[in-house]
Amino acid sequence: MSISIMTETRPESAEQQHHEVLQRPSDEPCSGCKQLQKDVAKTISMVMERMDKLQYRLDELLKENNELKSSSVSSGKASPSPAESRSSPKLVETVVAPVSGARKRKPKERSPPAAASPLPDFSNLMNGFMFDPLNMSNPNGMMQLLSMVQQQQQQQQHHQHIENQQSVSPPQSKSVKIEDPMDQDVKQEESERSDIPTATEAQNLLDALTAQFSSNGQATSTTSPPSSSSQVQAVIEAVATPSSQSQDSSMFEKTETSGDPNAARCSNCRTDKTTAWRRDAEGKLVCNPCGLYYRLHKVRRPIEMRKNHIQQRYRRKNKEKESSAATQIFNQLLTQMPTMATGGVSTDGAINTFNLLEQISQFTQAQELMNSSATF
């Protein structure tokens, strides 16, 4: 009997101990909780330090702003604070165009930005100033060029006058000093006369311009006016000469692609004229229409759709307008050429020469536009 009682009381005591362990409250936290508490306390302390630094920085900025405001008020000029200059964006005034029923067209680019200008480089001649009427966006560029030419002429005259004074012997210095003003006036008149192109030079320049205009982009004879010692005449010669490099390159490309049996041809329609070359699924060379047709329909383009010329859209009207504008400018130049060539020598000679230079630059711009429209 005693053995049975002992065996029955053992499981009851084990269950009571297990319940006591479960119900006993945990006095000490585990190691994970301790580490978490340490991390939280560390991050809170770091955040508080950063907040203190930010507060200190804001106080310094406010002090600087107040000092700037006080100094600007005392001097009578309002200057923006550095915080406002950093935060406030710049307001750009935009002009709102009136709403109209007309269709807005994209502005046509006259010349590509990467294309090189056919005119020569005058950087060595004009103290680093590049004179290019095709790429000149500033409308006052011509006036700047003319002012630089005038300054260089005055400097040359001054140097010549100093050299003439140094070359004179000492015994004749008194007579030279007495006659200096008259000699200076005479030398200035002679230099102005030498700078102004004569009637024969103007006629030669007119012949070169007429030959260039009649050719319309073809190769012309390189006839230039006689050489002169003045820099203005050199600029006129450089501007008046046709852009032979661009014309020769375009003619060379045309002759290469015209009758060359080894030229690139489309493997589908056998054409050699296209705006861009592409590759089909097999890697063969195809023209732009055949490549786009295959990409869209996944089928080869029928040969019946072949056109041995590049389609031109809205080109004829623009070409006629540009050619008419070029003829008007050329006629105006022809009418104004005799008056500018035979103008006043003593007072208005330099002004007439500069007007001639400006007219020549306008004519070259018009002809470049006409040549660019003809290549489309």
Swiss-Prot record:
Disruption phenotype: RNAi-mediated knockdown in hermaphrodites causes their progeny to arrest late in embryogenesis (pretzel stage) or as early L1 larvae. Arrested L1 larvae are invariably uncoordinated, lumpy and somewhat short and stout. Also, the entire larval buccal capsule, the cuticular structure of the mouth, invariably fails to attach to the anterior-most region of the head. Its main location: nucleus. Expressed in differentiated seam cells. Expressed in the head and trunk. The keyword Nuclease does not apply. One of its GO terms (cellular component) is nucleus. Residues 9-27, 176-195 have a biased composition (Basic and acidic residues). Residues 1-33, 65-122, 148-197, 240-264 are annotated as: Disordered. One of its GO terms (molecular function) is zinc ion binding. It is found in: Nucleus. Probable transcription factor. Involved in embryonic development and in vulval development in larvae, acting redundantly, at least in part, with elt-6. Perhaps acting together with elt-6, may form a positive feedback loop to initiate and maintain lin-39 gene expression to ensure proper vulval precursor cell (VPC) fate specification. Together with elt-6, acts as a downstream target of the Wnt/beta-catenin asymmetry pathway, required to adopt or maintain the seam cell fate. This is Putative transcription factor egl-18.
